[in-house]
From Swiss-Prot:
Superkingdom to which the source organism belongs: Eukaryota
Membrane topology field: Multi-pass membrane protein
Protein name: Uncharacterized protein ycf92
Membership in a protein family: Belongs to the ycf92 family.
Coiled coil: none
Localization terms from the record: Plastid, Chloroplast membrane
Transmembrane region(s): 32-52, 72-92, 133-153, 175-195, 216-236, 266-286
Assigned GO CC terms: chloroplast membrane
UniProt KW keywords: Chloroplast, Membrane, Plastid, Transmembrane, Transmembrane helix
Length: 287
């Protein structure tokens, strides 16, 4: 079924013909929701497959390859920093687990059966190694899938489209209406203030010597602050673009500066994208 739709003229000029740009914003949001649900369900091996799938999808996009490659490198760098942070946490866990294991095995020596002692030692070693690997890899995969899926949606969907999608949602638009612009700007200001205040508190307490932290915890704390700064700066930049799009939407509504174009409301490719994405996650879940 076809219909006429009022959209801004600048959005009409910025439309692209690549396959991922033609996917509706609602379907992209649905796929991102499936990705976030899979984070809490799938194992780290399946999450690796999802991360590689996201990278493969980004290389199939012909337009804006320089922008996509730049964001991919930024996300990989942030993922590496997350891996370093989780690796330091995993080392602390390993040291603690080894101490607990040595204490437990020393108590187990009292038993006369040596085979049971050997079995306990092997079982604990395997459990520590498996937990060490999961603690190191899973947070990095969580971070990469979450951030890069958002980036792909933001790159391949203009802020105007996201604003129109939000505007079509009666519940969201009824709650926020034009105040959504104020919420985005306020959230950006709050996040920036929190980052600056945390940084100042750490600097002052470190200079005064009142920050009593172990040396093994100081570096992970600084790495986490660096990751949060890079992550929130990206969020702030994207929220400003969405806020500008909201301002443009309100201005276009007041000036009636819209272009009437003939668009298709829904077609077979949209349904096919939903079916393929759902089957992809079902197959991974059952594998």
């Amino acid at each position: 079924m076809a219909t006429f739709e009022l959209i801004p003229y600048r959005l009409y000029l910025s439309q692209s013909n690549t396959w991922i740009h033609r996917i509706k914003a609602e379907i992209k949001i649905y796929i991102v929701a499936l990705l976030w649900i899979s984070i809490f369900i799938f194992s780290y091996f399946k999450l690796c497959i999802i991360a590689l799938s996201l990278i493969a999808i980004s290389f199939t996009i012909r337009s804006k390859q320089n922008i996509i490659q730049k964001h991919l490198l930024q996300t990989l760098l942030m993922t590496f920093l997350t891996t370093v942070l989780s690796f330091s946490v995993a080392i602390s866990y390993k040291q603690y687990a080894e101490q607990e294991q040595s204490q437990y095995l020393s108590d187990s020596k009292k038993y006369k059966n040596s085979s049971s002692y050997y079995y306990i030692q092997i079982a604990n070693d395997q459990r520590i190694k498996r937990q060490y690997l999961i603690t190191t890899l899973k947070p990095s995969l969580y971070f990469f899938i979450t951030i890069y899926s958002i980036k792909l949606v933001m790159i391949t969907t203009s802020p105007e489209v996201l604003v129109i999608t939000i505007y079509r949602s009666r519940i969201i638009n009824k709650i926020f209406k034009n105040e959504l612009l104020f919420i985005f700007l306020l959230s950006s200001h709050i996040v920036t203030s929190i980052i600056n205040r945390i940084d100042k508190v750490i600097q002052v307490t470190s200079l005064r010597g009142s920050l009593n932290l172990y040396n093994s915890l100081t570096r992970p704390l600084m790495f986490s602050l660096l990751i949060f700064q890079v992550f929130f700066l990206e969020i702030i930049r994207e929220s400003k673009e969405i806020a500008q799009a909201l301002y443009t939407r309100n201005l276009n509504q007041e000036n009636n500066n819209f272009l009437k174009i003939y668009t298709v409301k829904s077609n077979f490719s949209d349904r096919l994208n939903i079916i393929i994405s759902t089957l992809y996650f079902i197959i991974l879940a059952l594998a």
